[in-house]
Amino acid sequence: MGLVDRGWALPERNKTLPMYLKEQGYTTHLIGFQHEAINAYTLGYDTISKRRAEPLHNCHKLNRSYQKFFEIHQNDEKPFYLCMGVSQVHRPFGIWGDPVDPKIVLIPPYLPDNKIVREDLSQFYGAIQGVDTCIGKIIKQLEDFSLRENTLFIYTTDHGEAYPRAKCTLYDPGLKTLLLMSWPGSDILQQNKKFNQMISNIDLLPTLLDLIGAKIPKNVEGKSFLTLLKGESDTFRKEIYSEKSFHEYYDPLRCIRTDEFKFIINFEKSENLYQIGMDIQQDALGKFMLDYIKKTRPNEELYDLDNDPNEKDNLIDDPNYKEIGKELKDKLYKWMKLTADPILKGKIKDLRQESPIRF
């Protein structure tokens, strides 16, 4: 529903990936950032690095911690799970590395092309290059300690980039996340293999359990996409569902996405076409975009992704799309009922604390 440093928490009945892996004989470890719980030990980690790289977790400053970990665990009898959390592509971008030339940056179709946007993107791309360099060093460390061949390396993100119409929205730039998987010693993951099928974040946990031969509990909502990785299937999900309720503010959104269409419900009225996170608002780009998006937001949105991949033309009132809109809306409400979505009972209570906990 919302951020853990603003009053929200995972239900105690929920088991995490580290908990499941411990049951399979893995040791579990965390270095760097997490924001699933106030107390990271409740997530099932055996060890948690105390080293912090302020003001946010910087991959380069944590590099020594990674190297020490691999050195200690290179000859372990038990397999290990290590979560490495970094925030270098989180705002503010400028503190993480050298910006690229603003003249050569690629402008996403959902942003205007001007000096403010180009300068901001140049810092963002610089931060990405910094993380890319750091990941290269981590992979080199795995090789140096003879761990690379038998280690499944996963690089992923929790949401889209921190830009208006991306982060904190259910448009594709906010929903699409990075997922890279590499396992040189396995014949399951082929090098340079790309997949275009839709998957959801909740599918990663059952896939990892499936990869190690563990039984997937019936109460796990995600689906293993191991058959995709093995090339045994070309199809996976026909649709995915997404939601947002709180970030720094209450902004309840729900959506269903298929390969061809997307249907979004905005449960709260807004004078802005879409809301902007505080981290974006505080930068020059955000202040500019607040004026750029002054337009009343519709209650419902429907997009033909084949003909309008940038989600600019809302077809909710187009009679030619009335049938598909109703079909997607019915499916979305069915999913909301299945997941006991509290929005069905009205406005969700705000649990934000007056003094947010920092961790």
Identify what each model region corresponds to.
Residues 305-307:
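Extracellular, beta-strand-rich glycan-interacting domains
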Residues 1-294, 300, 309-337, 343-359:
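Formylglycine-dependent sulfatase
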